[in-house]
UniProtKB/Swiss-Prot annotation:
The keyword Lipid metabolism does not apply. Disulfide bonds join C52-C66, C56-C77, C71-C82. It comes from the Eukaryota. It comes from Cyriopagopus hainanus (Chinese bird spider). This is U4-theraphotoxin-Hhn1a.
């Protein structure tokens, strides 16, 4: 009985803390809304495209064969750009 009561009170406390934290983030405008574009991920995508093509161009200028830079995290370098696999 005591264990069940402790578990219920712990869950209630966690729920209250989680809800309070979510309300604070929402008030600060840091929570994403459904359908809202993820600008940070878009910026990462642009960085990956730029990073791969610049790396390849630098290697070409050095009179070397262009070795495409490896893209990590589910990305592949193709035509001097990192593309999602």
């Amino acid at each position: 009985m005591k264990v069940t009561l402790i578990a219920i009170l712990t869950c209630a406390a966690v729920l209250v803390l989680h809800t309070t934290a979510a309300e604070e983030l929402e008030a600060e405008g840091q929570l994403m809304e459904v359908g809202m574009p993820d600008t940070e991920l878009a910026a990462v995508d642009e960085e990956r495209l730029f990073e791969c093509s610049v790396s390849c161009e630098i290697e070409k200028e050095g009179n070397k064969d262009c070795k495409k830079k490896k893209c990590k995290g589910g990305w592949k370098c193709k035509f001097n750009m990192c593309v999602k696999v």
